[in-house]
């Protein structure tokens, strides 16, 4: 399944006609904006260390579409295979050269389905990602808490030692003062 998805995606990314150039550039802009939004949301979730890494929006967009097709075919099974899943069985609405008159309407329906699926899969993956991030943060917080507890115990021992030394010196001074 995954091997067949890559060549079909490459074929669909190439625009053969002049009229499709406008639609293709609009689709590319949409993919870039969706990829940028996802990248921004992921960077907010991952924190400052992950923000430093920069990813090419076109690479993210093509990887997301490929992952969408693979994940969708695994999750939904045969129900959606003929309904416009990228890399699965052919669909007349997905390729503009087969239906030139109604290609814009069919393409927008295909893109809406693709974006909805992308949003669903993205949320599931983000939930898993958020859980992993929370686990790591919980581990770091636990380690820091252990360190602070050890530090607190050490300070408590030092305070007790200092207090006993102060008390013993006061008693010694009192005894010496009384002897004079």
UniProtKB/Swiss-Prot annotation:
TM spans (from-to): 160-178
Residue ranges with Polar residues bias: 96-107
Pfam families xref list: Miff
Keywords tagged on the record: Apoptosis, Endoplasmic reticulum, Membrane, Mitochondrion, Mitochondrion outer membrane, Transmembrane, Transmembrane helix
Sequence ranges of Gly residues compositional bias: 84-93
Membrane topology: Single-pass membrane protein
GO cellular component, as recorded: endoplasmic reticulum; endoplasmic reticulum membrane; mitochondria-associated endoplasmic reticulum membrane contact site; mitochondrial outer membrane
One Gene Ontology molecular-function label: ubiquitin protein ligase binding
BP terms from Gene Ontology: apoptotic process; negative regulation of apoptotic process; negative regulation of mitochondrial calcium ion concentration
Compartment annotation: Mitochondrion; Mitochondrion outer membrane; Endoplasmic reticulum membrane
InterPro entries with a match to the protein in the record: FATE1 (IPR039153), Mff-like_dom (IPR039433)
Residue span of region Disordered: 77-108
Function per UniProt: Involved in the regulation of endoplasmic reticulum (ER)-mitochondria coupling. Negatively regulates the ER-mitochondria distance and Ca(2+) transfer from ER to mitochondria possibly implicating it in the regulation of apoptosis. May collaborate with RNF183 to restrain BIK protein levels thus regulating apoptotic signaling.
Assembly and oligomerization: Interacts with BIK and RNF183. Interacts with IMMT/MIC60and EMD.
Name by which UniProt lists this protein: Fetal and adult testis-expressed transcript protein homolog
Organism expressing this protein natively: Bos taurus
């Amino acid at each position: 399944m995954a091997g067949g998805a890559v060549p079909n995606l490459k074929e669909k990314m190439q625009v053969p006609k002049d009229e499709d150039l406008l639609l293709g550039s609009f689709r590319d802009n949409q993919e870039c904006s969706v990829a940028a939004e996802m990248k921004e949301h992921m960077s907010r979730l991952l924190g400052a260390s992950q923000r430093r890494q920069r990813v090419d929006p076109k690479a993210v967009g093509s990887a997301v579409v490929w992952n969408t097709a693979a994940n969708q075919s695994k999750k939904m099974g045969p129900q959606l295979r003929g309904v416009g899943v990228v890399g699965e069985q052919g669909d007349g609405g997905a390729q503009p050269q087969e239906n030139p008159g109604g290609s814009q309407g069919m393409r927008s329906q295909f893109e809406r389905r693709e974006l909805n699926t992308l949003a669903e899969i993205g949320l599931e993956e983000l939930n898993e990602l958020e859980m992993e991030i929370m686990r790591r943060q919980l581990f770091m917080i636990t380690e820091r808490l252990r360190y602070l507890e050890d530090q607190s115990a050490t300070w408590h021992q030092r305070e007790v030692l200092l207090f006993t030394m102060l008390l013993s010196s006061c008693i010694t001074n009192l005894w010496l003062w009384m002897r004079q």
